């Protein structure tokens, strides 16, 4: 039997961190088992759904690299199938029409609470029996599933172990509303049955739904999938993860400069572990992932840890991979790569210093765009009269260079130091400010090599003009 998992988000918002981790676990399990992964959009709530949310979910899945084998399927296009199964259950007396109004049910619930009874639907309540008896053909009604009254529902959760719920705790679930819309707990059963889903991996907030769904599977004679319920993700303060803890949408992490491999690595470790290993390639995640290694306990989201992972992936990934995701940020900042070095060379040089792709884009700018002024603090400290002689000598030497290599540029700096009998900082820092516009960069000889001879010469001249003006105004 082919293992088949699914991710089934509701398009009422963006793909959030909790949903992304659930999708990742489902995707990894399917890949680990040589199975298939299905994407299904649960869009039966027509009032709250939006195409924008659907697009955001699909964009987030693509960005994270979780491609699906089937789908996306849309529940809103399957109403005929749901009605067909409702009719089957009605014909087999496994479902029935209920004419009790919402007002009547609210009244009964208030009485139960006043009498300190468990508030629940009871088909045999005299007022409900009377409402059904008084109904006429064509009156508004819901369809309820006839839940077993005896026994228990038992299932082996692949994360939490054996779970047992008495049927006496479950009431007769509405499977179709008065407006004809099918309900969540019903349609997911029909979908998972039709789509051959073998493992349902989802959040622990669905545990209470599982026994209700299992009873529907059994009433339909459908195979019951295995279930695995993941613990929730908390903020680093122990509260439920929310916007105040930082980004909660997957695409917000894209916007903030994270690599998908870093986010995937971080999310997989929010609940799953393999010894003390922290860094996992996608191939390792697929090969090592198992539900038995997923913790029952909630995990705390730590942005500092994610930032550390992002820096690791920026500096250790192939430059071509980083460049693929950096391009979006370069576009946002209107940095064109048409006039400058290969971006992969810039990534090799600058990437190690950057925690995010936003930082990397910012630190790439001076390789491709000229600046009109120097950073004030750096210029005040390093572009002074004392730097004039070293910069003039360096300018003459770089203009005379026939081979523009990092080694030759390093030799130029050493020659300036030797001829003027100055320390490296007396020329290195003024050159850095002149060439980059600021006081921080990788090794200045390597930076100069990538910036290119024409720009380096022009920028040293600009720095000398700045010093001359500063002296004139002193």
UniProtKB/Swiss-Prot annotation:
Entry keywords, A to Z: Aminoacyl-tRNA synthetase, ATP-binding, Cytoplasm, Ligase, Nucleotide-binding, Protein biosynthesis
Gene Ontology cellular component annotations, sorted alphabetically: cytosol
Segments forming a coiled coil: none
Any single Pfam family the record assigns to this protein: tRNA-synt_1c
UniProt short sequence motif 'HIGH' region, positions renumbered to this chain: 9-19
E.C. number: 6.1.1.17
Catalyzed chemical reaction(s): tRNA(Glu) + L-glutamate + ATP = L-glutamyl-tRNA(Glu) + AMP + diphosphate
Alphabetized InterPro entries for the sequence: aa-tRNA-synth_I_cd-bd, aa-tRNA-synth_I_codon-bd_sub2, aa-tRNA-synth_I_CS, aa_tRNA-synth_I_cd-bd_sf, Glu-tRNA-ligase_bac/mito, Glu/Gln-tRNA-synth, Glu/Gln-tRNA-synth_Ib_cat-dom, GluQ/Sye
Gene Ontology MF terms: ATP binding; glutamate-tRNA ligase activity; tRNA binding; zinc ion binding
GO biological process, one term: glutamyl-tRNA aminoacylation
Signal recorded as keyword: no
Position of sequence motif 'KMSKS' region: 240-244
Protein location: Cytoplasm
Keyword hit for Glycoprotein: no
Binding residues annotated for ATP, in chain numbering: 243
Assembly information from the UniProt record: Monomer.
Family: Belongs to the class-I aminoacyl-tRNA synthetase family. Glutamate--tRNA ligase type 1 subfamily.
Job description of the protein: Catalyzes the attachment of glutamate to tRNA(Glu) in a two-step reaction: glutamate is first activated by ATP to form Glu-AMP and then transferred to the acceptor end of tRNA(Glu).
Protein name (Swiss-Prot/TrEMBL): Glutamate--tRNA ligase
Organism: Aliivibrio fischeri (strain ATCC 700601 / ES114) (Vibrio fischeri)
